[in-house]
Amino acid sequence: MQNEKTQSKKPSPVPAEHSPMMAQYFGLKADYPDTLLFYRMGDFYELFFADAEKAARLLNITLTQRGQSAGQPVVMAGVPFHSVDTYLARLIKLGESVAICEQVGEVTGKGPVERKVVRVVTPGTLTDLELLSDKSESMLLAVHQGPRNTCGLAWLSVTQGEVHLAECAVDDLAQWVLRIAPGEIIFSAGTTPTFEARLRGAPLAGAVSVSVRPDWQFDAGLGEKKLLAQLQAASLAPWQAQDLPQAHAAAAALLGYAEHTQGQALTHIQSVRVQRSDELIDLPPTTRRNLELTQTLRGEDQPTLFSLLDTCMTGMGSRLLKNWLLEPRRDRGEAQQRLNAIAALQSGDAHTSRAGVWRQLREQLKGSTDVERITARIALRQVRPRELVALQLTLQKTELLTHTTRGLEVYLTQISGHLLAPEACADLLARAIDPEPAVLVRDGGVIASGFDAELDELRAIQTNCDGFLLDLEVREKARTGIANLRVQFNKVHGFFIEVTQGQVDKVPDDYRRRQTLKNAERFITPELKAFEDKALSAQERALAREKWLYEQVLDQLQVFVPALTRVARALATLDALCALTERSLTLDWCAPQFVKEPCLDITQGRHPVVQARLAETSSGAFIANDTRMGPKQRMQIITGPNMGGKSTYMRQIAVIVLLASMGSYVPASACRLGPIDAIHTRIGAADDLANAQSTFMLEMLEAAQILIAATPNSLVLMDEIGRGTSTFDGLALASSIATQLHDKTQAYTLFATHYFELTEFPAQHHAAINVHVSAAEAGRDIVFLHEIQPGPASKSYGIQVARLAGMPAAVLNQARQTLAALESQATQNQAQVDLFAAPPATETAADSAIETAVAALNPDNLSPREALEALYQLKKLASGKA
């Protein structure tokens, strides 16, 4: 995590010797001490002093000095207002936040123009479409440290209109943070150093802005009140969000900070969702990385499972699809609902045989705008004219989509019911906004003709301007006899009559000189001056009228925000379902079948990403394989050569399980799947130098986490465990870990190993079997067949793989000789340690003389004298004299 910001105290009062403008700047900057302040001056946003130096370094812009204030040079840097989004994007990517300060007053000539900060752009509260990724959310996360090793989480995307709440143990915090993937994190100044260190140690990619907020902002009572106000409700019970004090405390800070950055209340946030860890299939950080769900191991966006799945037509569809992939639920209800919808989209309406309806829907979705984000920008009054036009065009499409989905499966019918926005909304947009508006309201030309009579009248004056000037020019040429006389206009000098220097002596007395040029003179007449006043006044009044009308349109649109939010969700859901339908047909995937009993049964399973890459590169066909696992067969010991496909086979099973759990068809010819609560992976590792952890330490940490967390309903992938240490240590650990997984955890386990000794494991463990990746030798070459076959591998083919890698012949020859010698020694020494034998029983020592004597006594038959003699005898035995 980077770019820590703390809530600093305000600077001391501005010295009186500062200029009025700099005094204004320092007054504004005092409210944003840890944020870059973009201070609007004409056509530029200026930064001063430390902000200027930082911006110049980060943006590679020019740092200058201009004049003095309070006896010090004014250090400054600036960016043009028309390209500010480019610079904001670069700063946000670096984890910085920017306060945008605009001129809100009129130029009066008496002191500086009134300015105020209208919004704060931070990595976790982005709303500008230019700054946001189409396929990812900008998440703001608030974390509150609670009592007894607990914490509360609250997070939101300002463009989504929904607050998420969760409470968890501190030990689970890192996994929650990874799942949320925030762009910005805020936490309390009262957080303990240990908790803060754990939070900062969460495995996050890229720059994450971290802000420390005052402790009083994390108040559970305040949080509950804020949530109720957002929901306009008297109780949180309908959302099952009551009795979550730690999450409520985080929500108080979250909503307060989000409102602070936007400069207003977030009226569009009208939903709360509580997330509980036991509702989701656990996908730890290692699983997300090893399965390359959204990023490759090299940190690239493709080829990944998500990039293969995502053929969505809209950004909001892509984001929803990613959410389904990364947050599969243990309850199969939603997944089955999606599978039913995909089947219906494939086959169409049974009554009309509309096969291929998904193609029609995708064609209608094509070109749709991001309704979700535009709706948020309407609520925040930040929406631009062209975004409203795009929204209006998309709302027209919803009528077609509603008609196309009519009569389909129940879930699709429910979606269809939310697709239509109120007619009044689409009508308002069509009437109010010009079909080809300017980019910004301040440029004019935004409100449609016919919407407002006063605006039309003012525009008519401007429209008639050209005709008036042409008529005046004809009349003045006739009156003066100056053939090359021109009547013109520019923004600097307004309207004027231009006459060349050679014709100046012909101008009438009512011409008043306005400007002298090298080859011409410019004049104005009383008639032209009167028209100028009228025309320029009309232009200013028209622009002011447009701005006012645009604000009125935004006011009227506020009532439609909840309906537009539902439309956005329905469009995104339909888009994501159509994308999954297209993938299922194009890639020849099948519908998985969910069963209640423990079962992982895959016929002709394939790794979809690897198969797609092979198809792209013409590297041959992917070899499909079966997998059968259940109560009597929960572990596979997988052996075979490197490059043979062990890891691909293991990963494809995990990917198929994940795809089924999210509600997608799967790359197989058949799939039956029982309950799954987690997918754990231990595949590969690299030294973590930053945290001083070796490959082997990471390997053991990951294995330990799996042994602690896995259950009988978990899928566990173990690849080459124990290879990071000596052979005997590694073998001993691998066998013990396998035993624990088999006997205690009883998870579905795929255990790939190079330790041939582990192939003896199934002989003593009833629910384990040996399988191997097949290969064939052709002379000294090896041919990988990539088929999973029963039984252990016969050999490892390591030298053949080294030959394929280009190892020098001399090295290979020596390796063959060494291998032959080692195999000969192994044959001579047949005695082996039984790795899987039960722990030896404790040896029982022979009874001592005292124990024998005591055992021979019968106290009930002894007289007092005999008992006394026996006691003396035992004493002699104890002293060793007997």
From Swiss-Prot:
- Gene Ontology CC entries for this record: cytosol
Which UniProt key words apply to this protein? ATP-binding, DNA damage, DNA repair, DNA-binding, Nucleotide-binding
Provide the gene name from the record: mutS
Q: What's one Pfam family the UniProt record gives for this protein?
A: MutS_IV
Q: What is this protein called?
A: DNA mismatch repair protein MutS
Q: Where does ATP bind?
A: G640, P641, N642, M643, G644, G645, K646, S647
- Disulfide pattern: none
What does the similarity note say? Belongs to the DNA mismatch repair MutS family.
A GO MF term: ATP binding
Q: What does this protein do?
A: This protein is involved in the repair of mismatches in DNA. It is possible that it carries out the mismatch recognition step. This protein has a weak ATPase activity.
Q: Name one GO biological process term.
A: mismatch repair
